[in-house]
Amino acid sequence: MKLDLVKRTFNYAVVNKPSGMVCDASHTNNIITALTNEFTKILPSVNSSQFRLVQRLDRFVTGGLVVARNKKWADKVRKSFFQEGTLRLTRRYVGLIALDQIPESTQGTIDFPIQALEKDYRGKNKSRELFTYSAVTHYKLIPSARRTIKGVFPVFQQGPILPIILELETGRKNQIRDHIIQKFGVPLLNDDNFSDFKLNSEIPKDVNSKLYKSNQIALHSGLVIMENNGISQQFLFPVNNAYDRELW
């Protein structure tokens, strides 16, 4: 499983993550180890301790994210999530949902509150507290790209598949996955068990393998726009892994 290094600077790295890689250094097959391996091919002296996760993608979600290389830049990214400082990050995703009918309104804002367990998997044997968070997601459905897919897996037999573009205003845990269900009454493609496992203390090994050959979810971080001190950079991320492209 390969992590694509899109850009590297003294302050940050931009990467394209495959499905199955974890954004948590305490787990095996994690993004920090993979990023360190890529860097050491160019800079052998690089140590994994310099990398700081300021964005996270769920294990079975693909696409781009920014990783800070020092505390100053990490703080800068975190401030941007609260509209503070000089840095602005725009994060856009593309997802797939199965909808029999196209809603009258094909774009808008989802602002339902979401519930999530406290962010600490190290205490698996201890019940974690449940919190309610405010959350805001902007969306746009693409009716012209709606298709009925003839695939061998049950995940393609749930109805016509409709692409949706999503932009985060807040960055809560599982925000997009939660908001899709609340807004449309259906999950993202191959995310049918989300409502069951999101409040479990342990991370499940198998999420939706009965519907598809892997646990990959039809959600991809496709675009990151970074604006810093008047300079704007856009990073467009394809689904690079051929194995991951089959769901799309």
UniProtKB/Swiss-Prot annotation:
Pseudouridylate synthase responsible for the pseudouridine-2819 formation in mitochondrial 21S rRNA. May modulate the efficiency or the fidelity of the mitochondrial translation machinery. The active site is at D58. It catalyses: uridine(2819) in 21S rRNA = pseudouridine(2819) in 21S rRNA. This is 21S rRNA pseudouridine(2819) synthase. One of its GO terms (cellular component) is mitochondrion. Its EC number is 5.4.99.43. SUPFAM superfamilies: Pseudouridine synthase (SSF55120). Belongs to the pseudouridine synthase RluA family. One of its GO terms (molecular function) is 21S rRNA pseudouridine(2819) synthase activity. One of its GO terms (biological process) is enzyme-directed rRNA pseudouridine synthesis. Keywords: Isomerase, Mitochondrion, rRNA processing. It is found in: Mitochondrion. It comes from Candida albicans (strain SC5314 / ATCC MYA-2876) (Yeast). PROSITE patterns: PSI_RLU. The gene is PUS5. CDD domains: PseudoU_synth_RluA_like (cd02869).
